[in-house]
């Protein structure tokens, strides 16, 4: 394995290709973790370098694609030209239960299809008409969110006024989300804006409804926050929480509903999976309603057991005892999976580059299989994400923030990992380099990966990726 000095030299060599000014900026985002440091030593949440290939998305992607889109009983309007909605259509595999087009709308695409005349004369009347049509065609919808695209912000349409008017007319929530793509430096601002709109447009109504109707709570009510049910992840997590005796009142946003969202201020504990995208609303609920929150990790049996114990520690001895029973229940299953796959995967090296939590959360699952992480990085992390990462990585691990296409390729060529785990933009680049690859945004059409049952699928998929006989038929460029 490369040493700290080796990786620092690698970074310097890669940066030497850039012009001096660009190299100086990118140097702040590349580093090597050294044991005992409080963070990973890289800058984050800064504007991408103009002219480079970045894997980041925009604020619209963060709001519509991540936070709001999976809420299944709402109709989410991509307000602007057709392209943004079209290219974000059903890309994340947010599974849900329901009848599409009747009471669930997750895989449908709604757009206001802005034309030149809408830019010139404004799109408020068109938006109002669309909401009327939605109410007529899909009367069982639970509400509407308006996900504004770049032109809406540039021309100054008053989507808030339309939302207030239509909400009064329909008696349903109409939530305007100012997530124009040009705002911020990545999809991360879109997450924040989406959280703020829940705070400002959903919770005030929820507080009133909860006060009028009442809520029959229990001491064991929890909410799953920031699990988008990719390939069924939230379901496999929910099973474990219910097995230890907790009642899951709501899950955001995968397979979630607006009704569940409104019920969340009544829970006893918010369990946050994707910290980066949902910590804002979790902190708000802690401040306003006094609801504590806890980040958990259900990737790999080691972390699952630790997380179950930490969650149970927030409740009474009954829940703590049940947590131990559940951990013991799945122990044999986990040991059999590890016994089957670890001999085939032991010592294999991995480089990751994903989004908001997986560059650290998935590490324990790899380690449970005897695999070694030699490089990891985030697309849109903030400083606190890199601080949280220190507990997952080993000394001399290469760390890269908002890594460019060129940098990532050069790092991989030099470090020669056995497996690259990143996104769809990187997948075919590295497969053409004859490197095993797993798409870690949507599990390469597999999953779930959360929970004990998910770990079995994860182990199988890593084995299939690394030990497929096809790799013996093609060579990597550096071996020619």
Swiss-Prot record:
It catalyses: N2 + 8 reduced [2Fe-2S]-[ferredoxin] + 16 ATP + 16 H2O = H2 + 8 oxidized [2Fe-2S]-[ferredoxin] + 2 NH4(+) + 16 ADP + 16 phosphate + 6 H(+). Keywords: ATP-binding, Iron, Iron-sulfur, Metal-binding, Molybdenum, Nitrogen fixation, Nucleotide-binding, Oxidoreductase. This is Nitrogenase molybdenum-iron protein alpha chain. InterPro entries: Nase/OxRdtase_comp1, Nase_comp1_asu, Nase_comp1_CS, Nase_Mo-Fe_asu. Its EC number is 1.18.6.1. It holds the Pfam family Oxidored_nitro. [7Fe-Mo-9S-C-homocitryl] cluster binds at residues 274, 441. It comes from Crocosphaera subtropica (strain ATCC 51142 / BH68) (Cyanothece sp. (strain ATCC 51142)). This molybdenum-iron protein is part of the nitrogenase complex that catalyzes the key enzymatic reactions in nitrogen fixation. Belongs to the NifD/NifK/NifE/NifN family.
